[in-house]
Regions:
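Extended active-site neighborhood of metal-dependent phosphoesterases/phosphodiesterases
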Residues: 28, 35, 77-198
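Bacterial N-terminal signal peptides that target proteins for export
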Residues: 1-9
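N-terminal active-site segment of His-dependent metallophosphoesterases
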Residues: 20-87, 175-176, 180
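Bacterial N-terminal signal peptides
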Residues: 9-18
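Active-site glycine-centered loops adjacent to acidic/histidine catalytic or metal-binding residues
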Residues: 41, 73-74, 111-112, 155, ...
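Generic beta-sheet signal
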Residues: 69, 196-202
Length: 204
């Protein structure tokens, strides 16, 4: 293997707020690496410094060249979305993450807040936005960089948690998911994975 991927660039709200204050501008540690963003609990409708953080992601992107964004759920607080035409798609996502460097592939999964709305609409947005790529509630994809192979496995964690399955009025789709089917799929993917790096991503 020609390279070892020594770092993953993980962006969370806490991390980035600290990062903004430090105003680090030397991104050389990310040179010649397979960089991607991991972002969780994104959807704040523009509040809680969401827009400045999105701008920072774009500015950093100019230097480090992220391959994609791994969006690990709750792109839509607090009640999810109602449809692919819900205005929240604009105010939580499109108008916020509008920097040219963020016009890359986004690979999302569902969070518990999406489960309070129309979860199918989150999947169907794949047909609306070129950069929104969500083929299923859980899925896997492989990447290769200079001889190193990486497998990322996206899992749907909300139905795995009893609390959400029991609160049917608040999370109506959670109890409808086949938990055993997902776990069997996950076990099979992990058992057959041959890549150098294996990353499992979930909201919880």
């Amino acid at each position: 293997m020609n390279i070892k991927i020594k770092s993953l660039l993980i962006l969370s709200l806490i991390f980035v707020c600290t990062f903004v204050q430090a105003q680090l501008t030397d991104y050389s540690i990310f040179d010649k690496k397979f960089n991607f963003y991991v972002a969780n609990d994104l959807g704040r409708n523009g509040y809680y410094d969401q827009k400045p953080i999105a701008e920072l992601m774009g500015t950093m992107g100019e230097e480090i060249g992220p391959e994609f964004v791994l969006a690990t759920g709750d792109v839509h607080h607090f009640e999810g979305v109602r449809s692919v035409n819900d205005p929240l798609w604009m105010t939580n996502y499109e108008l916020i993450y509008s920097h040219p460097e963020l016009m890359i592939d986004w690979f999302p999964i569902l969070g518990n807040h999406e489960y309070r709305g129309n979860t199918q609409a989150v999947l169907d947005y794949t047909n609306i936005s070129r950069r929104w790529i969500m083929p299923n509630r859980y899925y896997t994809r492989t990447f290769e960089e200079k001889g190193a192979t990486i497998r990322i496995i996206w899992i749907d964690t909300t139905p795995l948690i009893e609390k959400y399955r029991k609160e049917r009025d608040k999370y109506p789709d959670a109890c409808k998911q086949d938990v055993n089917k997902q776990l069997s799929w996950l076990e099979s993917v992990l058992a057959n994975a041959k890549e150098d790096w294996i990353i499992v991503a979930g909201h919880h």
